[in-house]
Amino acid sequence: MSRVALYPGSFDPVTNGHVDVVRHAVVLCDQLIVAIGVHPGKTPLFPAGERLAMVRSVFAPVAEKAGCAFDCTTYDDLTVAAAQKAGATILIRGLRDGTDLDYEMQIAGMNETMAPGVHTVFVPASPGVRPITATLVRQIAAMGGDVSAFVPQSVASSLKTKFAG
């Protein structure tokens, strides 16, 4: 039986924290699907197509190195519904701290009620990436700060281009 996991998020932009979660996730499953949430009420910094390309270029080599099949997609419905549509039985969620855990436990409980066959697996962030959030990365980049310690090099370049001029 193939273990399919879905790792949902906005990935706006991809951070080293996301990469850390993927490095742990690819050893837990046979196929990892990264699902980018597209929400009508939100205006992301990077459009969905750019985020898909970013996710693919950063995460596919990590999955390949681990021998894990990889795919990425977008979704605009409930995360648990996206998992079911993708045939995933595992939802991967990264945890930075206790606040994340409290929030994610509530969601995991609701998801378990809606889709008993989809199980949430929490991946604790490595100490070096715990403080990183995409929101802070966007703010630092928007103010001309150096984000190279917080994101993959290709993402740092994309952010620099996005905020140039």
UniProtKB/Swiss-Prot annotation:
InterPro entries membership: Cyt_trans-like, PPAT, Rossmann-like_a/b/a_fold
Enzyme category, top tier: transferase
Site location (Transition state stabilizer): H18
Metal-binding found in the keyword field: no
Enzyme Commission number: 2.7.7.3
Principal localisation: cytoplasm
Binding-site list for substrate: S10, K42, T79, R93
UniProt pathway: Cofactor biosynthesis; coenzyme A biosynthesis; CoA from (R)-pantothenate: step 4/5
Domain of life: Bacteria
Keyword Nucleotide-binding: yes
Annotated Gene Ontology cellular component terms: cytoplasm
One protein family per Pfam: CTP_transf_like
Listed cofactors: Mg(2+)
Listed GO biological process terms: coenzyme A biosynthetic process
Coiled-coil annotated spans: none
Subcellular location: Cytoplasm
GO molecular function, one term: pantetheine-phosphate adenylyltransferase activity
Membership in a protein family: Belongs to the bacterial CoaD family.
Summary of subunit composition and partner proteins: Homohexamer.
Function: Reversibly transfers an adenylyl group from ATP to 4'-phosphopantetheine, yielding dephospho-CoA (dPCoA) and pyrophosphate.
Name listed for the protein in its UniProt record: Phosphopantetheine adenylyltransferase
Native species: Nitrobacter hamburgensis (strain DSM 10229 / NCIMB 13809 / X14)
